[in-house]
């Protein structure tokens, strides 16, 4: 175990101090990126007429962002759902792309982000909801909605290269 060997060599206090520094650095990088953003909202319409809706509010004084998915479609009986962890991963990815520095992904990235994801929505689906499209289609649509709300969306083939099982 690499962490155990580092603790044995340097001591727990030193290892924890470096771990905290990595998280603090990531947090500061995200906060700096937030200061350059503008508030926005986006509604991504799905083929079935439902929406992934997101509003992003920026507090430039606190250097925090609120990402609010209120109004997003409820979970559906098909496989176009994702668990909340997928939504969190997408948020982490999007905000990480806005950072100009080379930082590792870690919990510090989330500290300046206030996330609101409605219960039982298609991006916070719980068992027994089908979620096979969650890691592909739904995650990409959520990503596009976030980039749209931030005003940095660019056209691409999105998930046109995927093969999906189920209905």
Pin down the residues of each PLM region:
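N-terminal leader/propeptide and maturation segments of large enzyme subunits in energy/redox metabolism
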Residues: 1-29, 145, 150
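Glycine- and acidic
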Residues: 4-17, 69-82, 125-132
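Terminal presequence/propeptide segments associated with secretion/organelle targeting
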Residues: 8, 34-35, 72, 85-86, ...
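Electropositive phosphate-/nucleotide-binding environments in soluble metabolic enzymes
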Residues: 20-28, 85-89, 136, 140
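Phosphate/ATP-binding catalytic cores across multiple sugar-kinase/actin-like superfamilies
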Residues: 28-37
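Flexible, glycine/threonine-enriched loop-and-boundary segments that flank and lead into catalytic domains
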Residues: 36-58
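Short beta-strand elements
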Residues: 52-71
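Hydrophobic core positions in small helical hairpin nucleic-acid-binding modules
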Residues: 78-79, 83, 92-167
């Amino acid at each position: 175990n690499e962490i155990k060997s580092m603790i044995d060599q340097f001591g727990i206090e030193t290892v924890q101090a470096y771990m905290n520094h990595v998280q603090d650095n990531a947090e500061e990088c995200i906060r700096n990126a937030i200061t350059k953003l503008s508030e926005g909202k986006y509604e991504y319409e799905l083929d079935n007429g439902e929406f992934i809706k997101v509003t992003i509010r920026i507090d430039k004084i606190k250097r925090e962002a609120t990402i609010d998915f209120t109004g997003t479609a409820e979970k559906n009986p098909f496989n176009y759902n994702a668990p909340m962890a997928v939504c969190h991963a997408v948020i982490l990815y999007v905000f990480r792309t806005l950072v100009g520095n080379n930082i590792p992904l870690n919990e510090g990235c989330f500290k300046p982000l206030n996330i609101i994801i409605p219960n039982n929505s298609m991006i916070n689906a719980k068992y027994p909801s089908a979620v096979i499209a969650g890691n592909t289609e739904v995650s990409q649509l959520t990503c596009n909605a976030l980039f749209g709300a931030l005003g940095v969306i660019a056209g691409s083939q999105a998930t046109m290269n995927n093969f999906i099982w189920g209905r």
